[in-house]
A protein has these predicted regions:
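Gly/Lys-enriched N-terminal cap/neck module of very large, oligomeric protein machines
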Residues: 1-144
Length: 144
């Protein structure tokens, strides 16, 4: 899936996977709160199988970010971020196919507006929360 510059919206009927896309982006960027990902535990992101299809032992998401403008503090034009989790609970993170720490990914996106805690990926429930907040709280959020 390719997302262009500017604002991208994902629309579709209920149950078609819109929230799964948002969850995958949050997860690869380092989301640690499994409840944010609509799960009872982190391993729930791994495919549990279906009729005629066996469960998998691993989940992997990768995302490529273009750094042509040099806004990220790394000397690459294209940066691939990947995350894997195994049924054992072990997790791995990668930057450009080199294993790294979660902290390395968090540091890369710090102060860019693109990290896991940023408002660059917004779900409908977050919009509803923003609209119901007091004016001062909304102003602080936009200043972030």
């Amino acid at each position: 899936m390719k997302l262009g510059q500017g604002i991208t919206t994902v629309v579709g009927p209920n149950g078609c996977g819109k929230t799964n896309i948002v969850d995958a982006i949050r997860w690869v960027l380092g989301e640690q709160k499994y409840r944010v990902l609509r799960s009872g535990k982190m391993e729930d992101v791994i495919f549990n199988g279906a009729e005629g299809t066996k469960p998998l032992g691993v989940c992997e998401v990768s995302m490529t970010v273009h750094n042509n403008a040099g806004k990220l503090p790394i000397e690459y034009n294209d940066i691939e971020i990947a995350r894997r989790i195994y049924r054992s609970g072990d997790s791995e993170y990668y930057l450009n196919k080199t294993q790294c720490r979660l902290k390395d990914i968090m540091d890369l996106f710090m102060d860019t507006g693109m990290g896991v805690d940023a408002y660059s990926v917004i779900e409908l429930k977050m919009i509803e929360q923003i609209l119901s907040e007091m004016a001062d709280d909304r102003r602080k959020m936009f200043e972030e």
